[in-house]
Amino acid sequence: MIKREISVRQQTCALLQKNLLKKWRLKRESLMEWVSSLLLLLFLYWYPHGHGATDLSSVPTKDLGRVDSFRQSGFMIGYTPVTSMTQQIMEKVAATPFMADKKVLGLLDEENIKELTESHAEIIRVIFSDTFSYHLKFQFDQRIPTSRELRDHNAHCDGLYEDVNCLIAIFWKEGFVALQAAINAAIIETTTNHSVMEELLSVSGKFMKIHPFVRQEGILTDFFIFTCIISFSPITYYVSINVARERKRMKGLMMMMGLRDPAFWLSWGLLYAGFVFIMALSLALVIKSVQFFILTSFMVVFSLFLLYGLSMITLAFLMSALVRKSVLTGLSVFLLTIFWGSLGFTSLYRYLPAPVEWTLSLFSPFAFTLGMAQLLRVDYDLNSNAPPDPASGSNLIIATNFMLVFDAFLYLALMMYFEKVLPNEYGHQHSPLFFLKSSFWLQTRKPAHVILEDGIDPVPSSGDSFEPVSPEFHGKESIRIRNISKEYKGKPNKIEALKDLTLDIYEGQITAVLGHSGAGKSTLLNILSGLSVPTKGSVTIYNNNLSEMADLENILRIAGVCPQANVQFDFLTVRENLRLFAKIRGIPPQDVEKEVQRVLLELEMKNIQNILAQNLSGGQKRKLTFGIAILGDSQIFLLDEPTAGLDPFSRHRVWNLLKERRADRVVLFSTQFMDEADILADRKVFISNGRLKCAGSSLFLKKKWGVGYHLSLQLKEVCVPENITSLVKQHIPAAKLSAEGEGKLLYTLPLETTYRFPELCQSLDSCPGLGIENYGVSMTTLNEVFLKLEGKASIDEPEVDIVGEGQTERSGDTERLMEMEQTLSSLRETEKTDGMALWRQQTCAIAKVRLLKLKHERKTLLSVLLILVVGICPFLFENISTKIRQSSYTWELSPHDYFLAPGQQPQGMLTQLLIINKTEASIDDFIHSVERQNIALEVDASGTRDGTDDPSYNGALIVSGNEKNHSFSFACNTKRLNCFPVLMDILSNGLLGMVKPSARIQTDRSTYLMDETIHPLEDLWKTAFWLILTSACPPYIAMSSVTDYKNRAWFQLRVSGLFPSAYWVGQAMVDIPLYCFVFLFMSLMDYLFRFPDTMFSIISHVIQIPCSVGYAISLIFLTYVISFISRKGKKNSGIWSLSFYIITVFSVAVILLAFDVDGTQYYIIFLIPPSTLVGCLILSLHLFIGQIFEEGQVIEPFLVFLIPFLHVFIFIFTLRCLEWKFGKKTMRKDPIFRISPRNNDVYQNPEEPEDEDEDVQMERMRTANALVSTSFDEKPVIIASCLRKEYAGKQKHCLSKKKAKIATRNVSFCVRKGEILGLLGHNGAGKSTSLKMISGDTKVTAGQVLLKGSREGDTPGFLGYCPQENALWPNLTVKEHLEIFAAVRGLRKSHAAVAITRLADALKLQDQLKSPVKTLSEGVKRKLCFVLSILGNPSILLLDEPSTGLDPEGQQQIWQAIRAIIKNTDRGALLTTHYMAEAEALCDRVAILVSGRLRCIGSIQHLKSKFGKDYLLEMKVKTLEQVEPLNTEILRLFPQASRQERYSSLMAYKLPVEAVQPLSQAFFKLEKVKQTFDLEEYSLSQSTLEQVFLELSKEQELDGLELEELDSSIKWKLLPQEEA
């Protein structure tokens, strides 16, 4: 046994290599990931962010002149309230020079002013609070800035040549300061009788010197930052998708094989950390190249982006642990990025206090935006008056980087915590406080192979239903199961999969778990392998408690698990898959390759080791999954149907491998093949409905529930069965005739009468006149035991007859067969609709399918809902912004916004007020008056300063003149928006304080919004926006056909007789109304938010309604065309939706820009369908405002509105042409598309048949004759002539040629009326390919296929096709499937209901009729597919492994149905199978395919006679020690015996006919051997079909074909007849 040591490092490296291979091989996905990132980089590089440095220092400071130089007109002033004081004040204001010719009106209240506003263009409102307090109210966005204050990143000035314009000048130039000065002077004069009007109106204003500064253009820079925030979104989206998908599909299975959590996350983390590094480096280079950050170094920018990207990767990991669905994971990460990143703009605009900012930095997008804001402030600090503090800025940036690092580790910790605490897909979880337990930190590994001597509860005795365990196994109870129950939540009741199951599994034994479909076998194995958690009960495996997570890890460390679903990565080769899982399982690196080669050799997979897993056949995938399970030579093997889908030869290889590993190990497997359990398992455990029913060895079970031995007699043409029966009963009176068929009798002989066999055989040999050709004796089978157990209410009831394998039938089965025949024959009489009535019925059925699917397509509905929400956003934003604008606000003009108070420490942007005295006299009175306003002053008494040279002050007040007559001027820092109004109040209060110290004038600025009458055309952009947006909906609505194509439902419908046009029209019946609902909803919103009482609005809606309907239909059918063309790829609804949106945006832009060019708009509207509706809207706009159309040309644009309907016809015709050229074969003439069933084209086969068997040559001649036969009655129902199929291969390298993969070569056969032909062969031999060519699913490369209809000259209206893959809709119920296919096949509703009920009763599907398919077991799904294939009584049945996954009872039901449908009718069936008993039970003839060639064909008896003339002696020994002595004895008794390579405990010998003649002597010798060696059982009979199959496959060798060819390793050399 290989010593395994699980290493996180080794697992991480293996998974990282796997991820790199995935990125390399799935180039399309990788390209999309990097193209998205590259587009963002290019966008940032070319984006006009408007961010840069401005240097106006060389421009002279600007003098704004006197304040009373304002001379604008066109407005009037309204004030309120009207009092004597306010009236005096405003009269003085009206008398000022600049107010000449301007009205000043006093009104009672502000409402009166509003009424006055309606009749005047502009009114400036003066609202007095008291005599000294008022606010000036201007119309919004008129005469004053819209913002309260300049932000530190705003461009406060711009310069052109020698002219400098600054935002603060608007107060001066637009009259605010002039009006403020006049009102302030009037207040002073009215209240003090001291006039200062001249002093205030003569004030002049200047700008301080403008230092270089970094500017931004507001929203442009914000959007640039927003793009940086989402720059890692493509990476986080794909990491979310990849991690969530792999976590859901494969992680649990890998954990079951020993994977450690850190290795999984590290492998993806390291890969995407590399991606993040490249992206961060590129982003930093782009940002520095466009000079978005000017003073910040490259490494600082790079580190910020790198840490942000890494934190976003960890955030994606966290969300994948919280949100299980991959799409929702990616969407949630994206939405979180947008939300928290957008919220981070509050830090850029300083809306939040610092503690809140650092708290919100726990969300990395917010922390990143905060970091971007801090880097911007490094540049913006140039704008500040405060001295720069580089250390403070660096510390903040370092702190932000630390927060991003902290976020990454926090997300990782939370991810690991929730990964442990939240139940995974298998139900396992730790306790919420698991990290507080010492066992979590100090794990101690228990001894791996300690077996509990004493269990808590002994296995309950159930009478004689359980065989006592041999004493040698006492103390070897390695798996102890106690009272295990498992419940699943269902509707309406819970489903109990296991019920109080108690069982011991022993070391050194192979144990098989048997039971019907849904009995609980897979549930039990899933619980033992950690894939499911029991509802109650306990399980211990080698002293490890399964319910403890630490113990579960110990169990999985020593277990090899083969789950029911195949385990492989499709993008890896077979060898790469094995290497990966070998490393995961902890095999030392130096032994990995050796172990992989061992598995490849033992399972004979070396020839396919370099083939991608996705290209393997079903059997080869199963073999790979089993190979993964046996890697590392585990102590425990838990195998769930390990040989399902394997051919007999591969199945025997698996059996031998398990038998060789039995010693000192535990092997527990489940199977539906009773023969497999009989041969392989030492102990069989039967489970029924979740309860343990019986357990024991084959001999124990057969003795208790078997029927004894079977005597099989092959008869000559002339015989009397009654005489034979009489002879048999003469020797064995208890013998029963259990079956009588054509040329065959089958008797059941009791077990206790074996001693009479020699006498019976002697009598049979001595009576040649009875007409017996040969005979054989075989033991009862486990199939019979199973059916007997399932047919009894309880084990203790009296025994009843059972069905044996092959063609064994009991009387009860004969009755059921007759009942089945009656049921199916009654259904044959049902009338079917045709023509247009059938088309309408099919259309309604497809519409029903689409509607039922839509109910469960949450992604589609959420996507459409999101588009609706985004479409409503402009209306909502417009309304919100209108409400904001309409709400008046008042901003106080306070000196403390800019200037320090006396004694206050410098902080922020506050400075002292600079007063410069140029009067050469004392102005102490004025200075003291200003100081009384609580302002810190710096006085230049000497007057040496200019006031404009030093912008470190926010403002300066310059006093000039002489001692008696002072004049004043202001110098303002251009970055302080309200500087001039604030200085005017300071000056006014300074002058007022000199006269009346206690008084203070307070001016506020305010705005009001005009009640605008919005022209309807101004709302056009909102309508255009949602119309453009809704053009992105169809890919989310109308691409359901891609899913149907992927799950094969499309072809299943087509082969069932569906008209192509009915499929598309049925889809459209749901998709078009859904799309129209989108238009209706958005039109309603548009109407509600608009002004509907306008002529344009009414007419535009009248135009839009028919145009929108046509547009909706045209886009839906355009999407159908796209989905048909791209049906073989991924659905990609999102990509197509984005494409529609971008195309529409650019088309509309071209229409608007090139409208003056004659005809351009018409070409675009016609050639680009998504832009049609918006284009028509723009045309209607120009039509009704009369801007382009002259009188007499009105009809032409109206014809443009019919373009969508022209598109509808074009796309429907295109769809029809695509169906005709590239669609699958149609079974009926389509009444709408006018597509008829195609004449089968004949393609010459390039190969001539060589070295064919004579039976194959005769079949080829028979097929050729049938092709030219004119007799309808004699024509076979299926004719396959010279079929060849080649698949395009792949190039090994760029210079090599593509080598075709040949699946079938020159295969010819026909199926006659009433015949069932079986196709046999190894995995990948070409069986399924042959069926696909006959059904029309795959186009033949060469050859011809003819299918016979029910009437002469007709093709069959539909085929009964049961494909290898279940072509079902997961969310639809069984009954809905049956109703839909019944409608498609033409059954009337009433007849369909009867047919569904009868078929459900016949095949035991009544309890599952209302269950969704996704909740069904694989066996029930398979049964449903079969029922769908026989529904409507098709004339031809194509059955591809129809009974795979079914229990014996289900197999019997299907076999009976097939026989009832085909036998003695004009129907025919072609069947493929790996189950030889199925072929023997059903097939009239079988054909064996090898490497795509037909090697032999004929009846089963003919093949047995030709290739299996010898007798086969099989003996089952109880211990391996008996093998050699028994072999010696057999060779002594039968010297000509040839031992066959069969199975270690099942000894098989080929005996020539002469060696066993007479048979009586042979049985006499064998009875003696049985008693001497205490054999478990023996069988002497002619070769079965499986034995013939294995005999032929013994002498296989490598074919001369290349490895690319299908099943290239198998070349059969048929034994010549004389050698047989």
UniProtKB/Swiss-Prot annotation:
Expressed in heart, brain, lung, liver and skeletal muscle. Highly expressed in the liver, and is also abundant in heart and skeletal muscle. Highly expressed in liver. Its main location: membrane. The chain crosses the membrane at residues 30-50, 223-243, 267-287, 298-318, 326-346, 352-372, 396-416, 860-880, 979-999, 1023-1043, 1069-1089, 1105-1125, 1135-1155, 1164-1184, 1194-1214. Its EC number is 7.6.2.-. Induction: Down-regulated by digoxin. Keywords: ATP-binding, Cell membrane, Glycoprotein, Lipid transport, Membrane, Nucleotide-binding, Repeat, Translocase, Transmembrane, Transmembrane helix, Transport. GO terms for molecular function: ABC-type transporter activity; ABC-type xenobiotic transporter activity; ATP binding; ATP hydrolysis activity. It is a multi-pass membrane protein. Cholesterol efflux is increased by extracellularly applied taurocholate. The keyword ATP-binding applies. PROSITE patterns: ABC_TRANSPORTER_1, ABC_TRANSPORTER_2. ATP 1 binds at residues 515-522. ATP 2 binds at residues 1321-1328. GO terms for biological process: cholesterol efflux; cholesterol transport; positive regulation of cholesterol efflux; regulation of cholesterol efflux; sphingomyelin biosynthetic process; xenobiotic transmembrane transport; xenobiotic transport. Residues 479-714, 1283-1516 form the ABC transporter domain. It catalyses: taurocholate(in) + ATP + H2O = taurocholate(out) + ADP + phosphate + H(+); cholesterol(in) + ATP + H2O = cholesterol(out) + ADP + phosphate + H(+). Mediates cholesterol and taurocholate efflux. Through the interaction with ABCA1 potentiates the cholesterol efflux to lipid-free APOA1, in turn regulates high-density lipoprotein cholesterol levels. PANTHER family: ABC-TYPE ORGANIC ANION TRANSPORTER ABCA8 (PTHR19229:SF274), ATP-BINDING CASSETTE TRANSPORTER SUBFAMILY A ABCA (PTHR19229). Belongs to the ABC transporter superfamily. ABCA family. This is ABC-type organic anion transporter ABCA8B. It comes from Mus musculus (Mouse).
